[in-house]
Amino acid sequence: MFCASSSPITSPLYPKAYKFSQTKSNSKRFSSLRASLPVSDNKLLKFEYTPWLIVGLGNPGLKYYGTRHNIGFEMIDHIARATDISMNTIQSKALVGIGSVGEVPILLVKPQGYMNFSGESVGPLAAYYQIPLRHILMIYDDMGLSNGVLRLQPKGGHSQHNGLKNVTEHLNGCRGYPRLSIGIGNPPGNMDMKAFLLQKFSPLERKQMDEGLEQGVEGVKTLVEEGFSDSISRFNLGQKYKFHKV
């Protein structure tokens, strides 16, 4: 089921329906979000900009650091560095950083429950900050794409990804939220899928992935400022063919 982005969204933990309001008088939480930004940025921000909730999926703890299944966390770290956002707040079982891309407020999120319970952070945060479905960007690992290849989409299914499944459940079954898929390739031979997901990258894979993450930062910044414009179409096309030799 795809839910219209203009419809109110509810969360099982925050059952009251909500709809993001762009007026100052009706958005106290957005006011506090804006106030938490650096003073120099506050002078530039305008209330017509709807904030983005940008969530990277992964598992907490050093055991999972640098593994394929945690690439969503790595993408959030790259975005945080590029935008000078400190991931220094704990809210709704998640590590949260608040800042902006240009004039657009963003919240960077790394759920600290395990992957399969990511929705327990996403649902409450979306409800609390009144983020519309179309501005909830999920970042996750995708075995359907080659290692280091990225793709931005306005909506889609869960692709058998348990983290996405749980997020969708906590957004009332609505799948119409944007997502950034980060390719990690497929397990070689008869390798167990779980073992593959929890394995670290080879040196070549790591190089490809690091380049992809840097490109992903630019893709996310473009999405936040322009939406799903022609620039995103060009981004996806460039990603699709970047390893093809002419």
UniProtKB/Swiss-Prot annotation:
Pfam families, sorted: Pept_tRNA_hydro
GO biological process terms, semicolon-separated: mRNA processing; RNA splicing
Lineage: Eukaryota, Viridiplantae, Streptophyta, Embryophyta, Tracheophyta
Quaternary structure annotation from Swiss-Prot or TrEMBL: Part of large ribonucleo-protein complexes that include group IIB introns and either CAF1 or CAF2.
Keywords: Chloroplast, mRNA processing, mRNA splicing, Plastid, Ribonucleoprotein, RNA-binding, Transit peptide, tRNA-binding
Binding site for tRNA: Y64, Y114, N116, N162
Transit peptide start-stop: 1-34
Site (Stabilizes the basic form of H active site to accept a proton): D141
Protein name: Chloroplastic group IIB intron splicing facilitator CRS2-A, chloroplastic
Keyword Nucleotide-binding: no
Active site (UniProt): H69
Function as written in the Swiss-Prot or TrEMBL entry: Required for the splicing of group IIB introns in chloroplasts.
Similarity comment: family membership: Belongs to the PTH family. CRS2 subfamily.
GO annotation, cellular component aspect: chloroplast stroma; ribonucleoprotein complex
GO function terms (MF aspect): peptidyl-tRNA hydrolase activity; tRNA binding
Subcellular localization(s) per the UniProt record: Plastid, Chloroplast stroma
